[in-house]
Amino acid sequence: MDERQTVLPLTVHLLASSGDSLAFQLAVDRLLHRICPDVRLFLVSERAAPIKLYECQTKRPEFPGISVTLFLREDLGEERIDLLQSFFQLPPWTHVIADFQQGRSCPFKLPLCDYYSLDSHMPVWEMRHVHYGTEIVRLTVYCSCDNYEDAVRLYETILQKEATTQKAGFCFFVLYSTTHVSVQLSIKQLHPGISVQVKDACALQFAIHAVGQLVPLLPYPCVPISDARWQTQDYDGNKILLLVVDHTTATQRKAESKAASTLMVIPDNPSLPFTSLNRSMEAKVQNAKDTINPKNISVSSNYLDQSETIYNNTNPSQKLLAPHGIQMKETESNVDTGYTVVSLTSQQAYICELSENQQSAPAFEDIYFSTSQRKSPQNLPFKLEESSSSDVVEGSKALGMTGSMFHSERYQIHNSNISEEEEFFI
């Protein structure tokens, strides 16, 4: 549908036989496009099963339950009216030979009182001339004499607006209106003794916002046929569809839930991206280098890789080396001290923690490898930013051939106030 077209509160669904839906839709659009191009009142679709015909003898005469009347202005040109009239002469339109005037004489010329239809189970169409005013596309729902008052109240309840009464036994609702054209739904009362001929291949679909409060007010049961569509009928048997607008269907909720479950977990502080964290970390390392003049400090920026970081200290004999490609397993905690024991896939590494006096020793970075930090790489730069003064993690390992193990060494650093011993755990 064109985005410029206005959505009406009423849409007429025409159910065509298999293979006829496209031709029917083109025939209707070609006709109405020259009258009201900004709206689409009719939608044609194929019905799943053919209509079952029941032969029964009716004692009372029947009148079509739904009709479409086109009121065209004469002052806009006879050629335009003749063009629209010629469309009814082309297939798939068929001429309906019947007297629908209920005993009244036709006040217009005979061709304008002829009825046309796309199918015998669809509404009938006619054209009439008007001398002034706006042109009208009027969809008329006929009801029996006894059901007229109830039918008016029913459609007022569905449309949530009051009908405009023009004369006794006739009222209408304005669905769309401009200075040139008006689209209306009218309710017309039949004469006593005339029954309604229900059009089984036609359904009136109304857009509503809530169906819960409307269902108890309907004369017949309202059955859900989809997540957002309900079906019922009026007092004369005309099909009514209720489309709940602004409604999130169960399928949409399931799709949204599945999409939400696949989203990545947002870091604790999303306002600090990895690039800004790296810059802040590099600034702190540079300050530490100016203070203690280390020989070399290198920090791996690939947080998504779970390989350990290599640190080089001022003392050449104190180094913590980790070969690239070594993956960390799940960590364990020592039951006596509570410290974390880190295991590697191919070898064992021992992490040493040294503490110095913060008043006498210069500030440096404090990095801990724990279970939560290993699983969340973004915790590493957060730890580097928050540390203002801490101890240097040192360790040593002896490199060997395959099957060799790391050997632990114990380093002890003394200062004037505090002296702590570094512990190694397997």
UniProtKB/Swiss-Prot annotation:
Signal peptide: none annotated. InterPro entries: FAM124 (IPR029380), FAM124_dom (IPR046365). Disulfide bonds: none annotated. The keyword Nucleus applies. Keywords: Nucleus. One of its GO terms (cellular component) is nucleus. It is found in: Nucleus. Pfam families: FAM124. Belongs to the FAM124 family. This is Protein FAM124B. It comes from Xenopus tropicalis (Western clawed frog).
